[in-house]
């Protein structure tokens, strides 16, 4: 019976797939196909291609068992947050659509032209809207309330009211110089093997790594001035301001080839080619590499927005807010922020690990059980090959122990501050406590970075030249993180990573029970912290051991160039090659272009180059590979330069990093020194605080260096925590005038409120938790008679009743819950990674050759009958205005004598599931994939 049921389902699905496309094509031939329909058809096919590739990726991830390969771990670390994923998918559909239109138009006209030359602006707007891109190109609506001026939005939007998208999450990285693409729009540098730069091809990035960058783990020069914590802070802060998601699919859109299995350049695959003599024994010819997702409205899509005659080359998206706002702690989207908060606490706390403690102190929580398990498993559990990763404001918190340590430290600091602020202000709501603690933590991130970290990287002279003292908010300064900063300049820190993870005992000596680990032994390994003595041994190692010094002939060690993200012996990755390839993927201009941008002289000859790079052997190797100084990749050129005095970068990176930091500071309306953000008393207290004080307050350490970034010897260079100054939170105590008649406001179930002032009056702004909607007045004002209205109510939203934007995919059943919903799958299906789509669990019975044969016979007969009917209807049918075979995907075509019908994809029905795609609004389905049932 089970086999019969499977056969029946197979036949019904086959008939449906065959019948409806033929009927649809018959109607088109009868009445003609309007231009809008042709555009819609291309969009449907593009959605199918993108979603099929994404679906194949999801299925592969679901079925994979065992330890993840380095490439899979890299993909996991670059996995976009759901909101970013929606935007990336929309951009990929947009780009695929335009490429298909290009092929159609060029085939019809027999000449190369852009599809925007052949389509009306109305149709271009339809393409932009139907792809889902258009909403992300429009400026957000900025609330004009007292609350909007008190706390920064989690997305960073509306920081600048004249330019509300500046610095916001999920917007394009800024360009300080135009990109260099081989086709002028999108193709990376090095995409076409025959493309020449100054008469020479670019060298393969792996060759550059092997001959210029890589050194043995044993060849490490220690920094005699700075601790390993300086390196860790740089990486942590980089993750606060920049994250460029990779393509949402790990398979090529044109045919579904797995990017981990192909060595051809097929978007989004841009593999790193390996020289024959350096290939592993298995004979792998390349290392997998995925292109960064394009920002909506750029590259081939660019002509659809703004001036149609102006090219808008491919840009890359920053999934985080650009601002120094502690998004590493709180996230950059409302959805992630909700996940991170403890909603049962009246103290505005963040969630912590429910079971494990570090001598009574909190650990980060694990990701939800439904999320992909990509980290190393707990030791000693038989049969386990993967385990959960930590949940934090940035998804890379589990990459290396030093990052995990800082994420854990700031989680504890938030909860410490929140509890103390609640004790001072018992009348504050949970949301008010949370927002005030978040505000303080964000200010501390800004202070430690600009006061303590950046001057040591740039040196005092360059810091004064490029950053200088704070002179107030500048509404003309664009704080958006630049592409060259994120992709090249701030990656200088990779050359300061030590190959060993050092863990020290209470006397700051090598721990007898916790020996040092090679870095590759600690990648994505939460249990290095949880079962490795907790946070204290790692913090001691970061404080008391030196960073690796960036030396011109010792740039990066083997842990990063040969063993990156290695949890098994299956394969490897190379961070240096990834950095070089990423710069080419993003179209970054060459080294000399950036020197000219910074007012530095161009280096045209070997003698010129030797003035910037003291090591003659390194300079010679670089020129031998690149042939011309203009061809040098900017990351390598900046990395190899001589240090400025008392700095840890050369002149080019000092310029680029300094310009970026000044923009982040001066262009931030919520910068801690701006007069409206804190009171004078609060600013004075914040200035007293330091990273050493944060360590004292949140670990078991009792002695620390006065300056956490300065390496020193224990005990002579360490101070008692009692002598490390910190802020006094009394400056945050809130009092009300004696004549106040409003008193403390009433609490609202499943909601919250915060105080602010408007025109000298106390104001309450209410909000409901996710999954609830507010009924009543959102804002109450204190008058002489009391509050002007009764508090509102928060009512549960039935998300499952939203027919226009269902929360679950059509393959799943939606069940409403209090404050949320559940997507349920019938056995033997299970939820995919998105939590909304049902996919094959691998337990489905497989269709036999008999059922397949019967299905084929039925399809053939049924299709033939339908074809005959349609051809008779359309004996005098109209001719299609656009040619067929636009996708190259082998779509079958129906031919009736001399007439040709526009072919339909066999997956048309599945593509129709995606027609009502989310425009990116909160709560909509973020992964509308082809049906699995």
From Swiss-Prot:
Known outcome of mutating residue 412 to H: In TDH2A; uncertain significance
PROSITE patterns: ASX_HYDROXYL (PS00010), EGF_2 (PS01186), EGF_3 (PS50026), EGF_CA (PS01187), PEROXIDASE_1 (PS00435), PEROXIDASE_3 (PS50292), SUSHI (PS50923)
UniProt topological domain (Extracellular) ranges: 19-846
Residues in the Cytoplasmic compartment per record: 872-933
Reaction catalysis annotation: 2 iodide + H2O2 + 2 H(+) = diiodine + 2 H2O; [thyroglobulin]-L-tyrosine + iodide + H2O2 + H(+) = [thyroglobulin]-3-iodo-L-tyrosine + 2 H2O; [thyroglobulin]-3-iodo-L-tyrosine + iodide + H2O2 + H(+) = [thyroglobulin]-3,5-diiodo-L-tyrosine + 2 H2O; 2 [thyroglobulin]-3,5-diiodo-L-tyrosine + H2O2 = [thyroglobulin]-L-thyroxine + [thyroglobulin]-dehydroalanine + 2 H2O
UniProt entry keywords in alphabetical sequence: Calcium, Congenital hypothyroidism, Disease variant, Disulfide bond, EGF-like domain, Glycoprotein, Heme, Hydrogen peroxide, Iron, Membrane, Metal-binding, Oxidoreductase, Peroxidase, Signal, Sushi, Thyroid hormones biosynthesis, Transmembrane, Transmembrane helix
Cited Gene3D superfamilies: Complement Module, domain 1, Haem peroxidase domain superfamily, animal type, Laminin
Bias-annotated ranges (Basic and acidic residues): 922-933
Mod. after translation: Glycosylated. Heme is covalently bound through a H(2)O(2)-dependent autocatalytic process. Heme insertion is important for the delivery of protein at the cell surface.
CDD domains assigned: CCP (cd00033), EGF_CA (cd00054), thyroid_peroxidase (cd09825)
Binding-site residues, heme b: 238, 399, 494
Cystine bridges: 142-158, 259-269, 263-286, 598-655, 696-721, 800-814, 808-823, 825-838
Any single GO BP term: thyroid hormone generation
Disease: An alternative splicing in the thyroperoxidase mRNA can cause Graves' disease. Thyroid dyshormonogenesis 2A: A disorder due to defective conversion of accumulated iodide to organically bound iodine. The iodide organification defect can be partial or complete.
Protein name: Thyroid peroxidase
Protein encoded by which gene: TPO
